[in-house]
Swiss-Prot record:
EC number: 3.5.2.7
Gene3D superfamilies in the record: Metal-dependent hydrolases (3.20.20.140), Urease, subunit C, domain 1 (2.30.40.10)
Binding site for Fe(3+): 72, 74, 242, 317
Pathway involvement of the protein, from the record: Amino-acid degradation; L-histidine degradation into L-glutamate; N-formimidoyl-L-glutamate from L-histidine: step 3/3
Keywords assigned: Cytoplasm, Histidine metabolism, Hydrolase, Iron, Metal-binding, Zinc
Locations listed in the record: Cytoplasm
InterPro entries: Amidohydro-rel, HutI, Metal-dep_hydrolase_composite, Metal_Hydrolase
Biological role stated in the UniProt entry: Catalyzes the hydrolytic cleavage of the carbon-nitrogen bond in imidazolone-5-propanoate to yield N-formimidoyl-L-glutamate. It is the third step in the universal histidine degradation pathway.
The protein's name in its UniProt record: Imidazolonepropionase
Positions bound to Zn(2+): 72, 74, 242, 317
UniProt enzyme class: hydrolase
Residues reported in the UniProt entry to bind 4-imidazolone-5-propanoate: 81, 144, 177, 245, 322
Family the entry assigns: Belongs to the metallo-dependent hydrolases superfamily. HutI family.
Length: 406
């Protein structure tokens, strides 16, 4: 290890949960030395070598965790769908709402009509509660434009959010989210547009870090998704997939075939799907908010993910229809309560495994030397409290790239 004699800032006085290896890996009364935006030393304060720090910050107890990562959101969209919330409470299914012109398509209309500035202002409003909870990295998908102009518009807004606020934003092109109204009955023709026009242009403009698709009976078939993935490969972009949310189509196996960085939802994933994901290194992104709001009854196969050592990430799935959730902390509790995950698994799901689901595990997700100085200081005594408490207990301090975030 390189000897450290100087640093920009030294932080100590709290217990540190590093999440190395997906476990708490507690450092009692730890210390973190930072130079620039990187951690240059971390360990017990009692073992701190002689380091000259330009600035010292002393915490009075509490817990430090890695900055939270929300690895699956649809945060940029026009309007909301609160009327559909009422419909679902009256027994109308998600599929029925979509068949009657609601669902994703109603948001597509609103998103196409909105200006870039309007979308930006609405997204800023939605993003700020997540920042307040300690989210330091977020993924934002397109998928409500469904034509070249509007998909580009959404991705530009997502990139702009990362320029305006102290948060890392990863963007995903989800043009294969639903069939736009002008292509009803012509899904293959729309996939032509996605593959030959939208994905190449998004790649040219460097607006996306990955490509996603929705593999489901009410969206696109595995064969159509495979075409999207081939186009993404040609453009040099990694892939992700909404898979097995409402039915078993072996989408997760298809995702694994293309070494997708994640497959998401997965309520209907089979053992063979999970085996394929394990072999490919594909992360399972679980979305308890959508499960809860849709009042689903089939849980993702948590025991199979454990058995085959598939990393489990968690995310808000913030979107206007099926998961209008602006709290990643709430997802920790839901994952434990609804899916029977442990608090330790849940915290790994919004730190190290979420980083892996975005392909940023080399720089984020755990607290260790060489990684970004992103962390959250909580006024808590045990990490399980992050999943235990519903509401309240906002972070005392969020540090983003070595600086206290206002």
């Amino acid at each position: 290890m390189v000897s450290v004699t100087h640093c920009d800032s030294l932080w100590f006085g709290a217990d540190i949960i590093t999440m190395r290896g997906g476990n708490y890996q507690l450092i009692p009364q730890g210390a973190i030395a930072v130079t620039g935006d990187k951690i240059v030393w971390i360990g017990p304060h009692a073992e701190l070598p002689p380091i000259h720090a330009a600035r010292q910050v002393v915490y009075e107890g509490g817990l430090i965790t890695p900055g939270l990562i929300d690895c699956h959101t649809h945060l940029v969209f026009g309007d909301d769908r609160s009327n559909e919330f009422e419909q679902r409470l009256n027994g109308v299914s998600y599929a029925e709402i979509a068949a009657n012109g609601g669902g994703i398509i109603s948001t597509v209309r609103a998103t196409r009509q909105a200006s870039e500035q309007q979308l930006l202002e609405q997204a800023l409003f939605r993003l700020k509660p997540l920042l307040a909870e300690g989210v330091t990295t977020i993924e934002i998908k397109s998928g409500y434009g469904l034509n070249l102009e509007s998909e580009i518009k959404m991705l530009r807004v997502a990139r702009r959010l990362g320029e305006l606020l102290p948060i890392d934003v990863k963007t995903t092109c989800l043009a294969a989210h639903a069939l736009p109204p002008e292509f009803i009955g012509q899904p293959d023709d729309y996939i032509d547009v996605v593959c030959n026009s939208i994905i190449p242009q998004v790649a040219v403009e460097n607006l996306a870090d990955a490509v996603d698709a929705f593999c489901e009976h009410l969206a696109f078939s595995p064969a159509q998704v495979e075409r999207v993935f081939l186009a993404a490969q040609k453009a040099g972009l990694p892939v992700k997939l909404h898979a097995e949310q409402l039915s078993a189509l072996r989408g997760a196996t298809l995702a694994a075939k293309f070494h997708a960085i994640s497959a998401d939802h997965l309520e209907y994933a089979t053992e063979s799907d999970v085996q394929a994901m394990a072999n490919a290194g594909t992360v399972a992104v679980l979305l308890p908010g959508a499960y809860y709001l849709l009042r689903e009854t089939q849980c993702p196969p948590i025991d199979l993910f454990r058995q085959y050592k598939v990393p489990m990430a968690l995310a808000s799935d913030a979107n206007p229809g099926t998961s209008p959730v602006l709290s990643l902390r709430l997802m920790l509790n839901m994952a434990c309560t609804l899916f029977r995950m442990t608090p330790e698994e849940a915290l790994a799901g919004v730190t190290c495994h979420a980083a892996q689901a975005l392909g940023v595990q080399q720089t984020q997700g755990t607290l260790e030397t060489g990684k970004l100085a992103n962390w959250v200081h909580w006024p808590l005594s045990h990490p399980a409290e992050l999943a235990y408490w519903l509401g309240g207990q906002l972070p005392a301090t969020v540090v983003f790239r070595g600086e206290v975030r206002p």
